[in-house]
């Protein structure tokens, strides 16, 4: 493949856009650098770049595009919004319809509020938890990304009982000291942190199924222990379901796992490809939010008709029979094919998969936390990424990210991808 136009456009982008990209994950820094491929259009399971190259897409915009690109039902909803006005600044019937759909799908959502991104949703749940409890600190888990607000850009201290340190320039140490970070899937470290800081903790923020250092499932009993220990200390439990809501079933990961948090943050899939976030939870907690309560949250674009109509349409597609069975069947096919080639080539590969989402780690170690994910071979992944790209398979340019199968992928797409993996593995 030739990427002449992509390279030229990237050079131009560098002159006008910081780093040439509008989100650092879109750069190829984590896979050795170079110009990222510039895409021109997308349809179904495929991308076409500015040089005319075609790709099978497993990026799915980092998760939102579960139906495939330009799904006709969602496209029609967006066209309807364009024709009737995309932004009112007033209440609309669509936000009521959509809120009811979310509540019906995820029973823990007694009340809901729409925002514009997953970052906003998480940020606001923390503010509401602080208002409800009168406390300031939060506990989060190492490697779990919760957006780019200051309070969640915090790395772990030297141990589970120590306070965090800033994970980005521009985050004050004073804010980092409001955060305790502990290893995911480690009940004892969490218990130790809560024994020390529990009376000051407003909320525990957790991905019920991790999506941000790869797909990682909770160990049996982990989430139950988080709920019990947090509630014993008087803290709330917030599930970050920005990636997981409607990813594995019609509803949240909490439905699949059979355990409910106090509040939930959502985004990505629920917007049907348009910008969106939502948060919700117990009524007594949510009534802390203005105009009913003292916790302020607002947004010019929040609940806009375009995002509401796209989200409604997306959920209508996902509610159809056989949707998640299709994703699971293709996911199992892809996992089996990759592992067969890995064994044949003698490569250290571990796959974490749930239904249509999987992560390929270049390690023989079982990956259950961030430290184990970090030990996977990033150099090997970088070579693999570029070999797959040359064969027309588009993956996320990071060893930590998931591959997302969409409703538009076919068995032929999976078969081609498996063959491409085999060719790539033989060159590693």
UniProtKB/Swiss-Prot annotation:
Subcellular location(s) of the protein: Cytoplasm
Cofactor: pyridoxal 5'-phosphate
Keyword field contains Protein biosynthesis: no
Any single Gene Ontology cellular-component annotation: cytoplasm
N6-(pyridoxal phosphate)lysine carried by residues: 268
An example Gene Ontology biological process: protoporphyrinogen IX biosynthetic process
Pathway participation: Porphyrin-containing compound metabolism; protoporphyrin-IX biosynthesis; 5-aminolevulinate from L-glutamyl-tRNA(Glu): step 2/2
Keywords from the named record: Cytoplasm, Isomerase, Porphyrin biosynthesis, Pyridoxal phosphate
Entries under CDD domains matching the protein: OAT_like
GO MF annotations in UniProt: glutamate-1-semialdehyde 2,1-aminomutase activity; pyridoxal phosphate binding; transaminase activity
EC number per UniProt: 5.4.3.8
Catalytic reactions of this protein: (S)-4-amino-5-oxopentanoate = 5-aminolevulinate
Description of how the protein assembles with itself and partners: Homodimer.
HAMAP family (UniProt xref): HemL_aminotrans_3 (MF_00375)
NCBIfam families: hemL, PRK00062.1, PRK12389.1
UniProt family annotation: Belongs to the class-III pyridoxal-phosphate-dependent aminotransferase family. HemL subfamily.
PANTHER family: GLUTAMATE-1-SEMIALDEHYDE 2,1-AMINOMUTASE (PTHR43713), GLUTAMATE-1-SEMIALDEHYDE 2,1-AMINOMUTASE 2 (PTHR43713:SF1)
Annotated protein name in UniProt: Glutamate-1-semialdehyde 2,1-aminomutase 1
Species classification: Bacteria, Bacillati, Bacillota, Bacilli, Bacillales
């Amino acid at each position: 493949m030739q990427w002449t136009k992509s390279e030229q456009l990237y050079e131009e982008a560098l002159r006008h856009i910081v780093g040439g990209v509008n989100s650092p994950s879109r750069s190829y820094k984590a896979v050795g650098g170079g110009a990222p491929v510039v895409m021109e259009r997308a349809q179904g399971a495929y991308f076409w770049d500015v040089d005319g190259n075609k790709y099978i897409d497993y990026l799915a915009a980092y998760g939102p595009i579960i139906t495939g690109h330009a799904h006709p039902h969602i496209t029609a909803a967006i066209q309807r919004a364009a024709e009737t006005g995309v932004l009112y600044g007033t209440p609309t019937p669509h936000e009521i319809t959509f809120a009811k759909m979310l509540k019906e799908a995820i029973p823990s959502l007694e009340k809901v509020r729409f925002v514009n991104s997953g970052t906003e949703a998480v940020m606001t749940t923390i503010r509401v938890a602080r208002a409800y409890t009168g406390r300031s600190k939060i506990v989060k888990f190492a490697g779990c990304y919760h957006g780019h607000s200051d309070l969640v850009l915090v790395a772990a201290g030297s141990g589970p009982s120590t306070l965090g340190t800033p994970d980005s320039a521009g985050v004050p140490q004073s804010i980092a000291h409001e955060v305790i970070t502990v290893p995911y899937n480690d009940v004892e470290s969490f218990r130790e942190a809560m024994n020390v800081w529990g009376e000051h903790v407003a909320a525990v923020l957790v991905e019920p199924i991790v999506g941000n250092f790869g797909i990682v499932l909770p160990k049996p009993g982990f989430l139950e222990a988080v709920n019990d220990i947090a509630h014993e200390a008087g803290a709330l439990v917030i599930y970050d379901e920005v990636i997981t809501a409607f990813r594995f079933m019609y509803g949240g990961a909490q439905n699949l796992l059979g355990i409910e948090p106090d509040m939930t943050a959502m985004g990505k899939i629920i917007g049907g490809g348009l910008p969106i976030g939502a948060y919700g939870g117990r009524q007594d907690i949510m009534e802390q939010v203005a105009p009913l309560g003292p916790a302020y949250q607002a947004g010019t674009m929040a609940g806009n008709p375009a995002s509401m109509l796209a989200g409604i349409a997306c959920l209508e597609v996902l509610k159809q029979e056989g949707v998640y069975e299709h994703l699971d069947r293709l996911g199992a096919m892809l996992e089996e094919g990759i592992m067969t080639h890995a064994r044949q080539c003698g490569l250290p590969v571990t796959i974490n998969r749930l239904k249509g989402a999987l992560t390929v780690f270049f390690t023989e170690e079982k990956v259950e936390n961030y430290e184990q994910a970090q030990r996977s071979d990033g150099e090997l992944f970088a070579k693999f990424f570029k070999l797959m790209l040359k064969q027309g398979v588009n993956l996320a340019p990071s060893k930590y990210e998931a591959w997302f199968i969409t409703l538009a992928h076919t068995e032929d797409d999976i078969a081609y991808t498996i063959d491409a993996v085999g060719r790539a593995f033989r060159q590693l």
